[in-house]
């Protein structure tokens, strides 16, 4: 890991592409910033209405909670083939810097002029290997959307958003800790995994894999 704090003053927002071809913020927990050469991504865990829009339920407490999870599991799982190289952690400013390569899979999949099969022929095998690698090492990876993956410069599939990593032996969490970041799209998975205010994230993962 490098030892200086990166200056992001001239970095640009990174926006994901959605299924209806709209560019929007890539995450509700952090501001995604891409350097001019598009090979480093800064994940700035903060409340930024300019990037994310108004989020009345989001609090700094929730942001900090997920920042700590991001750092913990990125560091803990650097040995996995699918984990992007961690370049720097700027704790005072809640920033994480990782290797990057221009765009996520969402940019390819949701662009009718592009084909993931043509650009990345073995994507299915690599995706299977990502899920298997987490399983074999004793973890669930809950966020598996197209915008959570990118292809690095070596042609390897990498996955981001390590705040959504859950150990096999520690998969319960109180809903009140994360309620402010539960969106409408996948809220049923939280609802169906909750008992007495506690969410079973193992069940959440199974719903993600089998239904969502």
Q: For the regions a protein language model found, what residue spans apply to each?
A:
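Protein kinase-like catalytic core scaffold
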Residues: 40, 82, 96, 158-161
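C-lobe/activation-segment region of protein kinase-like
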Residues: 152-212
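Catalytic-loop of the protein kinase fold
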Residues: 135-152
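Juxta-kinase regulatory segment immediately upstream of eukaryotic protein kinase catalytic domains
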Residues: 1-21
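Conserved structural core of kinase catalytic domains
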Residues: 63-66, 73-123
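ATP-binding glycine-rich loop module of kinase domains
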Residues: 14-75
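Short C-lobe core helix of eukaryotic-like protein kinase catalytic domains
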Residues: 126-135
């Amino acid at each position: 890991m490098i030892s200086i704090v990166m200056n992001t003053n001239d970095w640009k927002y990174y926006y994901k592409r959605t299924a209806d071809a709209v560019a929007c913020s890539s995450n509700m927990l952090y501001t995604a910033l891409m350097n001019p050469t598009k090979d480093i991504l800064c994940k700035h865990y903060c409340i930024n209405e300019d990037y994310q829009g108004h989020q009345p339920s989001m609090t700094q407490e929730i942001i900090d909670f997920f920042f700590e999870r991001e750092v913990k599991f990125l560091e803990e799982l650097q040995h996995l083939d699918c984990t992007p190289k961690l370049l720097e952690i700027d704790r005072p400013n809640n920033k994480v810097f990782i290797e990057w390569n221009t765009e996520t899979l969402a940019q390819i999949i949701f662009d009718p002029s592009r084909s993931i099969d043509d650009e990345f022929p073995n994507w299915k095998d690599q995706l299977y290997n990502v899920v298997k690698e987490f399983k074999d090492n004793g973890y669930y990876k809950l966020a598996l959307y197209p915008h959570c993956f990118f292809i690095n410069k070596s042609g390897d599939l990498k996955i981001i958003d390590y705040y959504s990593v859950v150990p096999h032996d520690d998969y319960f969490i109180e809903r009140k800790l994360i309620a402010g970041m539960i969106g409408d799209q996948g809220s049923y998975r939280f609802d169906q995994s909750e008992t007495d205010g506690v969410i079973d994230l193992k069940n959440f993962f199974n719903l993600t894999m089998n239904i969502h």
